[in-house]
């Protein structure tokens, strides 16, 4: 009598054991592809200052003079950046757009102290803050040239006439009479409305400087944004003594073009746009949002999955490649295991059961035949 034997375990697992080593491959790749500290020269001074950054103590100044940045040529918070085989001094200051004017020791006015330090870095010369606010314009020196040195009366006349040109005006000596010329071009200045001390609104700080030059009076910035009366200056000098006479026309053109632009929203709109910048148009009462890449919606609250992302640089490309390889291997392993279970295992069970049934049927028939013969 043949006893029934329980079917053996799925033999497909034995076949699939050969693919288990593939699961260890991603871990191996991660171990091999660990970020290795390069022996090349660091790209900036900040790399040497980070705890996990470059070890700059092993560099010899005498052996790497070509690649080391001389502190005498890159001062005032500048950073040495290696581009190819040369090293240059880079001044990358993250200055905000706050308008807090300061006057530098070089006689130039800057939007705030950060821009003053950036200019000192670019010029590689020391620039100190002389006073808060814009610099007062330089007046004529009054020193006569070689032509007028012999005539004290002529020199005194020219000095007193040129002294009236202030607030950025230049003295035109070639004219028949001495004119104060305002050679200030604001056509390339960005739109940033401001309220001036004369109670009028201007499209940018350059127009305030131009109006101060035209009127020959001190006009300063009082606040960001337009004044409460929301008026824009369109007047020109009353005495008509200046060379430029198109100030009113230019102001009107700038006012018309400004209506098509957007200005930043006031502070009470902070948080209006979740992933973007809040902008306010002159013709619109409600603000609008300029969403960042990858976001959409009225408040930039929705994720836009249709955005095509730029391929990363060579530094991060190896990590993207490793991630892609790992993902591909994992998908392949899963597919192999699924196919092995769904196809190989049922087929092996069917063959094994058929053999058992065949053997059992033959033994039973033989027993019955021998009984009949007896």
UniProtKB/Swiss-Prot annotation:
Primary residence: membrane
Residue ranges, Extracellular side: 41-320
Name the UniProt record assigns to this protein: Tomoregulin-2
Function, as annotated: May be a survival factor for hippocampal and mesencephalic neurons. The shedded form may up-regulate cell proliferation.
Highest taxon of source: Eukaryota
Residue ranges of the region described as Required for shedding: 303-320
Subcellular location: Membrane
PTM note: O-glycosylated; contains chondroitin sulfate glycosaminoglycans. A soluble form (TMEFF2-ECD) is produced by proteolytic shedding. This shedding can be induced by phorbol ester or pro-inflammatory cytokines such as TNFalpha, and is mediated by a metalloproteinase ADAM.
UniProt keyword annotation of Cytoplasm present: no
Positions of transmembrane segments: 321-341
Organism whose genome encodes this protein: Mus musculus (Mouse)
Keywords, in A-Z order: Disulfide bond, EGF-like domain, Glycoprotein, Membrane, Proteoglycan, Repeat, Signal, Transmembrane, Transmembrane helix
Keyword Disulfide bond recorded: yes
GO biological process, one term: negative regulation of stress fiber assembly
Chain ranges of the EGF-like domain: 261-301
Family annotation (InterPro entries): EGF-like_dom, Kazal_dom, Kazal_dom_sf
């Amino acid at each position: 009598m043949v006893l029934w034997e329980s079917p053996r375990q799925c033999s497909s697992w034995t076949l699939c054991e050969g693919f288990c080593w593939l699961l260890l491959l991603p871990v191996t790749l991660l171990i091999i592809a660990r970020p290795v500290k390069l022996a090349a020269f660091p790209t900036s001074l900040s790399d040497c200052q980070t705890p996990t950054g470059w070890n700059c103590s092993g560099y010899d100044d005498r052996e790497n003079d070509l690649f080391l940045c001389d502190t005498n040529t890159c001062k005032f918070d500048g950073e040495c950046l290696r581009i190819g085989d040369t090293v240059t001094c880079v001044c990358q200051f993250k200055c905000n757009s706050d308008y807090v004017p300061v006057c530098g020791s070089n006689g130039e006015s800057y939007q705030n102290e950060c821009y003053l330090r950036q200019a000192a870095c670019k010029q590689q010369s020391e620039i100190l803050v002389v006073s808060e606010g814009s610099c007062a314009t330089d007046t004529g020196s009054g020193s006569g040239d070689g032509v007028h040195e012999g005539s004290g009366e002529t020199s005194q006349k020219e000095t007193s006439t040129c002294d009236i040109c202030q607030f950025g005006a230049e003295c035109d000596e070639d004219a028949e009479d001495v004119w104060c010329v305002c050679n200030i071009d604001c056509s390339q200045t960005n739109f940033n409305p401001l309220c001036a001390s004369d109670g009028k609104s201007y499209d940018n700080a350059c127009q305030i400087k131009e109006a101060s030059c035209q009127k020959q009076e001190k006009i300063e910035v009082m606040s960001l944004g337009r004044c409460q009366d929301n008026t824009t200056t369109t007047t020109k000098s009353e005495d008509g003594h200046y060379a430029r006479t198109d100030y009113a026309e230019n102001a009107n053109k700038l006012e018309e073009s400004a209506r098509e632009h957007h200005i930043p929203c006031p502070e009470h709109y902070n948080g209006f746009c979740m992933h973007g910048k809040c902008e306010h148009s002159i013709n619109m009462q409600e603000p609008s949002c300029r969403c960042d890449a990858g976001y959409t919606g009225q408040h930039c609250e929705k994720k836009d999955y249709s955005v095509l992302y730029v391929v990363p640089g060579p530094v991060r490309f190896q990590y993207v490649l490793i991630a892609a390889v790992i993902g591909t291997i994992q998908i392949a392993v899963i597919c192999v295991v699924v196919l092995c279970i769904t196809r190989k295992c049922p087929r092996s069970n069917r063959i094994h059961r058929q053999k058992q049934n065949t053997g059992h049927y033959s033994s039973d028939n033989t027993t019955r035949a021998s009984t009949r013969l007896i």
